[in-house]
Structure formats: structure tokens, C-alpha cells
Amino acid sequence: MGFSLSNFTSDPFAISTVSFGIMAWVVAIAGAASSKQENFPHFSWWGISYQIVIILIIFVLYANNNIELYKFTLVGLVSIAFIYTTNSTNNLIYNSNSAGNLCCAAGCILLSILNLIWILYFGGHPESPTNQFIDSFSLRGQGHEQLGSGSHNHNANNANNNIPIGAGNAIIGKGEMSPYDDRFAASGVNQPTSESLRLASGPQMGNGPFTTTGAIINPNLQQPLSGSIGGSAHHTPTNINNNNNNNTGYMTSSHLTGLENFSSPHVPGSGTGAGLGVGAGRDLTHNSNGGGGSGGGPASANNSNNTNKRNTIYTDSETGTGITFRYKAKALYSYDANPDDINEISFVKDEILEVDDIDGKWWQARRANGQVGICPSNYVKLLDT
């Protein structure tokens, strides 16, 4: 999680209540310091000291983004502070006419009001009307630095350093990212060309007749020459001439997620499509061990090896992005994604989402239609599974 002032400043309720509490406490401590000590209730000093400790604790919890984990503890602590401030107010008003005592009493009255608000909010259920009204003022357009201790911004700033192809993002120029679902990566529609793909430096192709871990993006052909196409991952020739070594990028086998179904006329056993398209008549839902689709190897391969076919439609535990969604959450409110942030997803109230990476104020989420993105954690509630 980590300490970050942005976690505190992004919550209007936290800013307003903590700021109000500090001002009220300054009024109370100023009145206590200016009053005659023989007429001042000595126990009120402890109540004033206890109150500033509670204010600092709440500030630290908001800054560390774990206020939700200590709400019930805070209810008990703030309730004690409420008793102290109300008792001090009674003693200061009715037992002395000192100006300092009355000033301290005014500060204690303000602190009592603040403590009552905190008790109602921290002790209330997230779906209660009061909590829903307060949470409705939360900022939507913040920079999402809270996700995984700022990993959202860190990954966006370093997008050009190491982005695996088919992992849900492609680089369109410098720093711009365009999401697309890996399940449609083989369609050849709206796919970046090889000129626009910038890959991190990977292992070079071997010198032997075959390779098992490489794939070449040939800028002249504008299509991948993959080592895992059509089930023939171990039979990609390496003696293919490349006329432009400067524009050639290399991918390891871990980068091939989502490119398995790409076809190329230069690779044995693949379809006959060009560019990033699909081979003619290629069956995208099943692959056989024989290395041929209906666009490559013999047609009998798909008929005789039905038991060896693999369904390439992703299951609940295989999303194409390498994320396993371990939790389910219910949307407490409807949310419209920020059009300027391609990573956000929209959802409606009471919709059931699959979530993961639940640290921070922004969680990884997947809708029922398969859309993957991030959602604000204060708009959803984890369900018991």
C-alpha cells in the first residue's frame, strides 16, 4: 500500500473532516492554555491530548489507504473521544466564567460534532443512506496512482520498456496504449502493424535448423513468423532471410500469448492469411496436435484427432492477460468510465464483477461480458464465496 498524500487528498470526506478537526482542536488548546489553571478541569487536558492522537491516526490510515481495515476500531476510539469532549464542554461552561475556559468549551463543542460524524460514518454500512451520500462526492477523475501502490502510473510510464504482445495492450507510438482483448487478437482487425510494435530486446534465434522460443516480426511482410502457430511450435525454420535487421524485433515464447492463431504462408502448418489476418477456413476454436488447421495441413487431422483438440476459448481461470480473478464483488453504484482513461470499465449498480489485485483504491476487474479493466474500490463490495 505505502504512505502517499494523494490517497488522503483524493478523498473529500477525509480532507474536510480532518481539516475541521485540526482547526477545532487548535481553538480548544488555545483556550486551555490561556485559562487560569486553578479554574480549569485538569482531566480536560487528557481529553484534548487524546483527541489530537485520534485525528493523526485517521490521517495516517487514509494516507496509507487502509482506512477500511480499521473502521470498527475507529468507532470505539472515537466514541471515547466523544465522551471526553462532551464532558469537558459541560465542565467548562457551567463551572467557570473564564474567557479561556469558554474558548476551550467552544473548541470541544466542535470536536464533539466531528466525533459524532465520524461515529456515524465509520460505524455505518457501506450501503447505508448516509454512507452512500458521503461517498457520492468521491473524486472519479483521479490519476489512479492508488492501484497497487502506484503501479498503474508506473506501468503506463514504462509502457515502451516491456510490453508483451497479446497481453492486452499494444503500443501505438510513444507512451500511448491501446487495449484489445486477446481473444480477438487473431481477427486481424484494428491490429497494430509490425512497424508500430516496439518490443523489448529478447533472445536471438538459434543457429540450428529449428527453434522453440523465437518469433520474428518481419517489417517487409508485416506479419509474424511465429514458432507456435498451428500446433507446430517446434518446427519454425530459422533460415528465413531478413532484409532489414534494424527493424526486426524478437519475442520470447512468453510474448506469444494471443498470437497462437496468427497464420502465415511462410510457416509450415499455418493458414494462408496475410499480415495479421486469419488463414482461409481456419478453425479458431480448436487446434489439433497435427500442426495443420483447415488452412494448412491435411483435412483429416481435424477429423481423426478430436480427442486431442484444445478449446482456445478462455475459461474463468484463463483470461488471456495472465490474471486469475479470485474474488467476486457486487457494484454498489453505477459507474461510467473516464473516457480519457482506457483502463477503466463501466458497470451498473448490482452488477457482479470478478476482481483481483484488491490492494489500493482501484481494483482489477472483469465484467460478465469478458471486459477487463480497473474499477474504484469504493463503488463495489466483496462477496463471500
Swiss-Prot record:
Pfam families: SH3_9. Its main location: membrane. The chain crosses the membrane at residues 13-33, 43-63, 66-86, 102-122. Residues 268-315 are annotated as: Disordered. GO terms for cellular component: plasma membrane. It is found in: Cell membrane. Residues 270-280, 289-298 have a biased composition (Gly residues). This is High osmolarity signaling protein SHO1.
